[in-house]
Amino acid sequence: MRMNKRTLLFVSLVSAAFLGCQIFFGYQDLKSCQDLAEKQRAISEQILASTEQLSVVPWTASAEESESVNQYAVRLGNRLLVLTKGGAHSEVHSKGTSWKLIDQTSTFGGILVSLYGEDGQEVLSKGGSVYLPNQQDALPVLVAEFRRNQEPLVFFGEYKNGKLSNKAGTIYGTSLVFLNTGNEFVPLGIYNSKEECVESLDLPMARAVVFADKENLTTSGSYYMLANEYMQVIVSQESGAIEGINLPFASDREGNKSIVNEIGFDRELAAGSPSEASFPGVQAIDSQRQNVSSVVGGYYPLLRRGTLSDTRKMVSPQYQALNIVSGRELSSPVATGFRVVSFDNKTLVLESGDGGIRKTYTLGEQPYAFDLEIQTTRGQEDLWITSGVPEVEIMSNAFVPAVKYHAVKKNKSDLINVKLPKAKDSLLVRNDASPQWILNSNGYFGVILTPKTPLPTGYASSFIPGNAVPTRLTQLSPKDQAYPASKYPGYTAMLPLPKEAGRYQFMVYAGPLSEPTLKALDRAHTNHKGESPEYVDAIAFRGFFSFITEPFAALLFIIMKFFQFLTGSWGISIILLTIVLKLVLYPLNAWSIRSMRRMQKLSPYIQDIQQKYKREPKRAQMEIMALYKVNKVNPITGCLPLIIQIPFLIAMFDLLKSSFLLRGASFIPGWIDNLTAPDVLFSWETPIWFIGKEFHLLPILLGIVMFAQQKISAIKRSGPVSDQQRQQEAMGTMMALLFTFMFYNFPSGLNIYWLSSMLLGVIQQWATNKILDEKHLQHEVIVNKKR
């Protein structure tokens, strides 16, 4: 019996201890729950206070009914979302305002979600279609959790793989889930806490949200395409930057406004490497969420894309255009794994996975231009925006990349050339300049970045090895290494971003450096003070003698544009330009020819003087000079026409490098298809040293004409040929050969100009010689009276 009492006492004590623990820990749990609830309520109130568009409000079914504390709705601007069981009211009231039913939809468990508005009219999201991210990314959302007899809690959560989570605790109640598109909140769906899944809402405000299905599931490797009549802009979801900018070729097709002509490289790539000439080049999605069909040819790739047939050799995201980079070499992207917030036919909005960066691409009205807005939610130092790497253009057989910026110094604007960095010092950073805009150019095309909001001072440029950003030209005769990647390095231009969080806007021009389009851009961006950004300065090609040739080049182009307007042909305009210059210079040329003719007539007398005074060279020189003087001959005058034409020749050379309108301009189809490239009469497979794989006829014709001119300029000789005359003939022949080799790989436009000039010179030489022969010029020689 005593044993039983002890056992009973022990059991009682254990039970009391257990009950005490239960009460103690229950109290602790209750206190923790109360603390958590208070914390959640405080967070909810803080979020609602900072979110003007979204709020939680009580509602009633009639105006006479007092607002119940357990009936709450979510207000989005002038719309109201109400959760009920059973039927929906045709009208509800909240805070003295009547709300009329717009639409309703049934969800799980008989829950009805009703949409009300003050005017009762339907409304769609302004942001276009909103795409959910791929299944691997978490989407930040705003959640309104409805709990029984309590005001809904509002907190930030994450949506992933159809699931909803809250870092602060478990979600127990039915919840409305909202997506912030930047301009507004749109309903993403309703959360079923029992099944732990989000279901879509069939409501006008929510129909703009598109749930990714299995057939159209986007991945982190997705690309999105914005397009108009001037360009395709291909944006990578992985980097949030531009993978490619493709410019359509000019054609007679209705609606085509492009001024970009197809050239030989484009045709060769389309025929020999169609995979490298495909556009958009990657599997892209348009604003209708349809896959964009790939085509071969028809576009010019402004940016280097690498080798499309080998993903290992495609351009790395760090070198894509309008990327935001940082790091020691300014080559590390600060954000990856972007998601599409909204997407329509003009605007694409992307947000980084961590929500730190939002980028908005908007196609503009101006040709080859679009806008970019970058929104950063937290400050960070040393952020830079990149220009991308332009594709290679061969200008007059040369690779001429350039980085320039436009700035105002001492109330005077100027376009300043940036010294390109080398492989050893691959990064150039300058903090002492304030560019109004910066240009990264390949000669005929360029990317211009213009900040529309204030930025820190400075700019940067970097050298990128050609193997890291291979040009498309490497696919032309790869066995022969006609265009090795290492020979064509890439360059980027960069502008700094402020370290403070905020919105920063840019105007981006990505297209031809053409006078018509850049002038139109200048007019569109001239401010109320009449100040122009002077984008047209970007087409200036500054050679070694630009201070001399620039006025001549401007004059030549004005005359050429006039003749092109009359004839419709740039080739004919070059020939007519040559005729005009010959007419203007005719008096000087005629005087020079007559002077040279007299020099030739004086040659026998000069030889006599040299023979007579061969032991007195000073005396012979004096007699020869006296002979020149009495016959009014200056030995230098024969060179004047050539000297005068040199500035025009160099100006024409520079003009062909700077005038985009001549690029791809055809003169004789099948032979002269591009005035800025050598003519091609025929070609072959195996390259020959210096000649290459193409036969250029124009420089050979030029050499023949120069040789003929030298023969025509020589007078008929009755006596033996002197050593000096033999040397002159040999020199003339060598000059003809030299010009043939020198001009062999020059642009056909330059060869047409020089060939036309030589032909007209031959005609003038022949006519002048004939006239002088008829006048018996040999009797006009006056011999010194004293020898």
Swiss-Prot record:
Disulfide-bond pairs as recorded: none
One MF term in the entry's GO annotations: membrane insertase activity
Membrane topology type: Multi-pass membrane protein
Lipid moiety-binding region (S-diacylglycerol cysteine): C21
Domain of life: Bacteria
Keyword Metal-binding in record: no
Residues with lipidation of kind N-palmitoyl cysteine: C21
GO cellular component terms given for this protein: plasma membrane
Coiled coil: none
Subcellular location: Cell inner membrane
Keyword Repeat on entry: no
Signal peptide stretch: 1-20
Single Gene Ontology BP annotation: protein insertion into membrane
Transmembrane parts of this sequence: 543-563, 565-585, 636-656, 688-708, 735-755
Database matches in InterPro entries: Membr_insert_YidC (IPR019998), YidC/ALB3/OXA1/COX18 (IPR001708), YidC/Oxa/ALB_C (IPR028055), YidC_ALB_C (IPR047196), YidC_periplasmic_sf (IPR038221)
Main location per the UniProt record: membrane
HAMAP family for this protein: YidC_type1 (MF_01810)
Family: Belongs to the OXA1/ALB3/YidC family. Type 1 subfamily.
SUBUNIT field: Interacts with the Sec translocase complex via SecD. Specifically interacts with transmembrane segments of nascent integral membrane proteins during membrane integration.
Function recorded in the entry: Required for the insertion and/or proper folding and/or complex formation of integral membrane proteins into the membrane. Involved in integration of membrane proteins that insert both dependently and independently of the Sec translocase complex, as well as at least some lipoproteins. Aids folding of multispanning membrane proteins.
Protein name according to UniProt: Membrane protein insertase YidC
Annotated organism of origin: Chlamydia muridarum (strain MoPn / Nigg)
Taxonomy of the source species: Bacteria, Pseudomonadati, Chlamydiota, Chlamydiia, Chlamydiales
Gene symbol of the encoding locus: yidC
